[in-house]
């Protein structure tokens, strides 16, 4: 019965899931060059996904078999509100404190893998464990992949908001893994728990400082400052040499007689 709920929801709302997956991939690719814009867009996308999951799953199909479904549903609504607030704050953030530029390359890689797992790995794991294709869970509709994708995006943020914004996804993923285990879906429960743990590791990995990030970007793009070699017949330039009045070259330690 529980698996059938996702089939009902996906059959009616699959365009919403398709649009959410496409936007998540675009934002994931955009983050390399425009991290602040990508993170702001991710916050807005995740807010929409949590709101859709609350409305269509918790307040919709799940409530028909479990009246207590409204409680996690309201938690998802609150999460959507916090994500929208975070997106608004990001608009006015400036300077080194602005979002997103400081996740290390390792953190960005692990976070991206968690996002991709939520988008494609989670439904693939369900298919591999014998679930019918029509009842697979997809991002922006089902709560599990939505929480996984959120955890992946949040893990790549520099802002300390990522800890507070990760509470609802982590609590839901832990509760869902226990629910799946209780329903004798041990393999699905194990995959979900492992994905959550990987996301938590990425969440707590050290961040780069703004200076470290700038240095890593220079090394990656090959834009680090290099001194041009002297031209033929030209004396090599000595760092620190200055010109005195009358055109005479002096070193900083030289005193004019």
What are these regions (language model features)?
Residues 68-150:
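Membrane-proximal helix-loop-helix units in multi-pass membrane proteins
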Residues 14-26, 75-91, 143-156, 191-206:
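Hydrophobic cores of alpha-helical transmembrane segments in multi-pass inner/ER membrane proteins
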Residues 36-47, 103-111, 158-169:
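Membrane-interfacial loop-to-transmembrane alpha-helix junctions, especially the N-terminal start
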């Amino acid at each position: 019965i529980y698996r059938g709920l996702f089939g009902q929801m996906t059959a009616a709302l699959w365009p919403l899931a398709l649009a959410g997956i496409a936007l998540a991939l675009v934002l994931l690719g955009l983050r390399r060059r425009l991290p602040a814009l990508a993170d702001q867009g991710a916050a807005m996308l995740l807010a929409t996904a949590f709101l859709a999951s609350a409305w269509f799953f918790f307040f919709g199909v799940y409530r028909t078999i479990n009246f207590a479904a409204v409680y996690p549903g309201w938690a998802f609504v609150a999460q959507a509100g916090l994500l929208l607030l975070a997106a608004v704050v990001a608009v006015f953030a400036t300077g080194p404190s602005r979002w997103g530029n400081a996740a290390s390359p390792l953190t960005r890689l692990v976070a991206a893998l968690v996002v991709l797992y939520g988008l494609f790995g989670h439904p693939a794991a369900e298919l591999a464990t014998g679930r019918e294709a029509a009842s697979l869970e997809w991002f922006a509709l089902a709560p599990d992949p939505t929480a996984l994708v959120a955890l992946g995006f949040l893990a790549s943020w520099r802002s300390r908001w990522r800890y507070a914004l990760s509470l609802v996804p982590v609590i839901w993923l832990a509760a869902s893994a226990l629910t799946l285990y209780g329903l004798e879906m041990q393999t699905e429960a194990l995959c979900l728990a492992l994905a959550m743990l990987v996301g938590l590791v990425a969440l707590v990995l050290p961040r780069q400082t703004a200076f470290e990030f700038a240095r890593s970007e220079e090394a990656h793009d090959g834009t680090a400052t290099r001194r041009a070699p002297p031209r033929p017949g030209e004396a090599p330039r000595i760092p620190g040499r200055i010109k005195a009045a009358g055109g005479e070259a002096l070193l900083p330690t030289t005193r004019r007689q």
